[in-house]
């Protein structure tokens, strides 16, 4: 198979935000008006069903057998399908139509060379692992397969996205929960959550990602309402009356009291608001990340993890690695990648060194990948088509072994040559890092048990 199915999303998902532009200020400042995930207008909004879902999630993840830890994940999603040949798996001895317009450079690890578009990553190669043999044969032009880490999770002809399989972030939300209960466990920093971030499938809306643009103002008290007033539990209880019907019949009023108190703490702690206050960051660090959409999201991801979020997905504009040719929005390989890669390169390299400087890197697993690779031969429009035979990805942190390359593609970047790494292997590695038993099963809508890792999936042995 050398191409993916038809485009899975229509043009309506191609937003105007560019990965080169700074983030809109409503994502950067505390006090965003968009509170739709947890808090609606006024104090009464604290009782929205999404809040109830989150509070029930806390009760679920605090059940016996779940050991809280500080392990977290940041997933950079390179929407559109990044070219493995032009980034992490260069073919310098191949013909020009295969090797493309870019050169290669040495890295900090002797013997490992990557595209000359990635000098910052080359400088921290000892902290990175490149996997050049990722099996993306089940994937299509959506985030579903790779973000779920499951070959059966994909867009199907009947429109039932993902076959009900949840994303790795949703599994993390259910079985690891948040690091800090004052924050949601799964956050998406993406321009288009629907197009770029896969959610919970049939696992339930409780475990859906919270969109970052909504998070900045989630937990602020409504205008004119003091924290002292919010802390008045009798007042809060009256305003939560309509939550009663959403609680299971077996839930006692004691449980409702717990949910209420937790909601109060979410507001009173101010942790979500503080996490979005980047004004406290050193301007030089912000410059290093890049004051662009992808750079500022990477910085926010670090702040989310630092504050207590478990799983964060970072994505730039929808499809911004979909480099079919110079006639389309994101252009071809040279015109598309040359201006884009300095921003992506800086964002990843700075995040890794920043996490290390703060003592967070061993607890934070960082992944960078897309849905598939791109064709070995450059087309007549100076682009590369979709390619599902093989792709490359990068991992860092997580207390794992780095400074290595795992697997390889053939001389043309056409197919996997050795050490195939599957989506389920990636999922097993992520869940092992998070302390989640990879044999765990959940109950689908059919009532049958479903493994969180597809058959055959094992943690990547070279890393762990």
State each model region's role:
Residues 2-464:
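Ligand-binding pockets and gating/stacking loops
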């Amino acid at each position: 198979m050398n191409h993916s199915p038809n485009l899975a999303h229509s043009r309506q998902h191609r937003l105007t935000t560019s990965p080169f532009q700074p983030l809109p200020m409503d994502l950067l400042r505390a006090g965003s008006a968009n509170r739709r995930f947890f808090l609606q207008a006024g104090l009464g909004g604290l009782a929205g069903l999404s809040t109830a879902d989150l509070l029930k999630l806390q009760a679920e993840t605090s059940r016996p057998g779940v050991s809280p830890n500080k392990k977290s994940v940041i997933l950079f999603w390179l929407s559109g399908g990044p070219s493995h040949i032009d980034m992490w798996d260069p073919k310098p001895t191949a013909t020009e139509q295969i090797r493309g317009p870019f050169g290669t450079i040495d890295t900090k690890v002797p013997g490992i060379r990557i595209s000359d578009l990635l000098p910052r990553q080359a400088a921290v190669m000892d902290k990175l692992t490149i996997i050049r043999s990722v099996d993306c044969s089940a994937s299509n032009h959506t985030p579903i397969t790779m973000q779920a880490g499951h070959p059966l999770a994909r867009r199907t002809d009947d429109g039932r996205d993902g076959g009900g399989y949840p994303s790795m972030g949703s599994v993390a939300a259910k079985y690891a929960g948040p690091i800090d209960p004052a924050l949601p466990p799964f956050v998406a920093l993406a321009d288009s959550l629907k197009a770029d971030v896969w959610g919970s499938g049939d696992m339930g809306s409780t475990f859906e990602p919270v969109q970052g643009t909504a998070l900045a103002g989630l937990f602020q008290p409504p205008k004119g309402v003091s924290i002292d007033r919010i802390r008045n539990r009798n007042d809060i209880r009256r305003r939560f009356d309509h939550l009663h019907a959403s609680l299971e019949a077996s839930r006692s009023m004691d449980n409702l009291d717990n949910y209420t108190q937790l909601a109060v703490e979410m507001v009173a702690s101010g942790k979500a608001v503080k996490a979005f206050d980047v004004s406290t960051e050193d301007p030089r660090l912000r410059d290093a990340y890049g004051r662009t959409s992808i750079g500022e999201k990477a910085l926010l991801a670090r702040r989310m993890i630092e504050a207590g979020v478990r799983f964060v997905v970072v994505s730039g504009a929808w499809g911004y690695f979909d480099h079919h040719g110079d006639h389309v929005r994101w252009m071809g390989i040279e015109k598309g990648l040359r201006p884009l890669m300095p921003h992506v390169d800086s964002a990843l390299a700075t995040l890794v060194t920043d996490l290390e400087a703060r003592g967070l890197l061993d607890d934070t697993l960082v992944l960078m990948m897309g849905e598939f690779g791109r064709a070995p031969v450059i087309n007549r429009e100076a682009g590369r088509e979709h390619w599902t035979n093989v792709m490359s990805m990068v991992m860092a942190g997580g207390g794992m072994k780095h400074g290595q390359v795992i697997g390889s593609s053939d001389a043309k970047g056409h197919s996997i040559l050795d050490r195939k790494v599957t989506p389920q292997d990636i999922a097993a590695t992520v869940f092992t890092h998070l302390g989640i038993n990879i044999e765990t099963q959940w109950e689908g809508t059919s009532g049958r048990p479903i493994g969180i890792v597809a058959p055959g999936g094992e943690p990547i042995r070279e890393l762990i």
